[in-house]
Amino acid sequence: MTTETAKNQTAGDDRSVPAPVDVPPVGEEINLDANENYFNRELSQLQFNYRVLKQALDTTHPLINRLIFCCIFSSNMDEFFEIRVAGLRQQMKYGRETVGADGMMPDQALAEISRVAHEYIREQYDILNNVLIPEMEEQNIHFVRRREWTPEQAEWVRTYFEEEILPVVSPIGLDPSHPFPRLVNKSLNFIVELDGKDAFGRETGMAIVPAPRSLPRLVRLPDDVCNGGENLVFLSSMIHAHADELFPGMEVKGCYQFRLTRNADLELEDDLEDLASALRGELLSRRFGDGVRLEVADNCPEELVQFLLKEFGLTERDLYQVHGPVNLTRLMAVGGLVDRPDLTYSGFSPSIPKLIRSKESMFDAIRKRPILLLHPYENFSPVVDLLRQAAKDPQVLAIRQTLYRTGADSEIVEALDGTTRPEAQRL
């Protein structure tokens, strides 16, 4: 196998990527123990994520879908860090380091992952700031910065802040009686520099402001305070603009967003007697696992950055300073906030096979003949209907299914949880 590199064929890109593997002649024996015959699993996944990011530059996709590809890259990288990177760090933490099939030790892999990930994430923000946002501006979709707010827009933002944000935000001053709070995995937070004394007479030079996940990260400005177009404001901009209202009587010297990614990998023993209980415990603890990555606004002062790194037990290798929002995944909301069907793919309505369009029992339909559903061309709802009926059917003893990456409002989970028969196993 060669170790040469080939140039990526994407127009305008001179990045080097691994060359295609040389296939040995037929009959030639392959040494399966040779490290050079294997790619590193984590670096290979990073390259896949990069291919997703490059879709954001593909002008054959509608503009909003290109932004979504940029967001999907962020979502993929989140999972990569909280599972893959976390797993390598766990090996080092507990002295269980093993050499991968590619010959890399965990520390070597982490160093190379950091180098490549920093490069990819820099390119992601470059694409966002210098390609996607300017193209959206041309399409009259504006991300309105604080310095660009008109007096009418600034007044609307103030009202929105006081009515929607202020009641649900809980600032946490840092002092000897108030240690650094436990922050939820991947939550948006702000570190605030302060001067003066708070309402209780305490000198608090620093505070943390967690932003509840219930708050939208993007808000659409109403048309009556804009001069046409689709105008969006970042939640971070609104909090920055009115941080002083969170700390009455104190001077806000700086406000900077940051986000911590934690270890979210599940560790279960092989000889578990109660899988469900073990999973419940692991799912609760994964919200507060060890830190694996710190994302910080690139204008955050160095002393605050170092303070955060020390607090989370991280190093410069784990630090990602970004020019823009620290969580681009939430920009997927743009598609639902703007009325521009010309800038996105049209919706697709999957069909339902004629045999199961009626309201009869899914079990009765299956008894007549096998039913094959081809997703996404055919609707998934018959599967959910089957699970709902099975959960209530007294003749069903157990429902066992593997679910991958379920959403917060999964219909399948709802169907399985809706059974009134506690004796039925749902695994």
Please place each PLM-identified region on the residue numbering.
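N-terminal localization/anchoring segments of enzymes in phospholipid and broader phosphate metabolism
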Residues: 2-427
